[in-house]
Amino acid sequence: MGYLTSSFVLFFLLCVTYTYAATIEVRNNCPYTVWAASTPIGGGRRLNRGQTWVINAPRGTKMARIWGRTGCNFNAAGRGTCQTGDCGGVLQCTGWGKPPNTLAEYALDQFSNLDFWDISLVDGFNIPMTFAPTKPSGGKCHAIHCTANINGECPRALKVPGGCNNPCTTFGGQQYCCTQGPCGPTELSKFFKKRCPDAYSYPQDDPTSTFTCPGGSTNYRVVFCPNGVADPNFPLEMPASTDEVAK
């Protein structure tokens, strides 16, 4: 009976392991606290400078996104607010964040057994970011970056506390939101694209902004402020925040 029990446990563990398509490591190199968020899996985690959060993403995960929240204040129950990236006033996100927020987006094991992933500024920008496979395999499976000083150079019409908002949220309409058919870049989307050519700058910016890696065998790393305190392109002021409760 003991042998059968051990065999069952081993089989169960192997099945659980097999269901994970990718491990995604989220690291905060910013000189301030970032409250990382991840949906539809993960929820949220407070990351002080230098801390890492590991997310195990199942096969078939899609429409997934990771972002950083700044200027947060949560109570012991995990309720509060964030200056940027807030997701309904909770630490454990179940929905998307409020713009502006720099996004790492991914879908695992999709068409032709490929992972599809990107950095998106369609919701605006709040924190510099790198998104990378841990073992690049050539082609479009390589690190991508958005580390420009977008907050410092943000057009006045898009500038908000803690970030640089997106034109759709700010102005609305088909020209910026692309909700009613094909659309092209605008002068405001070109502002983002010039500074972060790897990233989506408007909703239909697919050709230069979507990256792929082999599904089921690739792990990833998302880094906030990848250049840390030595980053000459990013202002080092601390985002507004009050007392926080770590979870």
Swiss-Prot record:
Protein name, entry field: Osmotin-like protein NP24-I
GO molecular function: beta-glucanase activity
PROSITE patterns the UniProt entry points to: THAUMATIN_1, THAUMATIN_2
Gene that produces this protein: NP24-I
Principal cellular location given in the protein's record: cytoplasm
Enzyme class label: hydrolase
Subcellular location as annotated: Cytoplasm; Vacuole
Key word Hydrolase present: yes
Signal peptide as annotated in the record: 1-21
InterPro entries (alphabetical): Osmotin/thaumatin-like_sf, Thaumatin, Thaumatin_CS
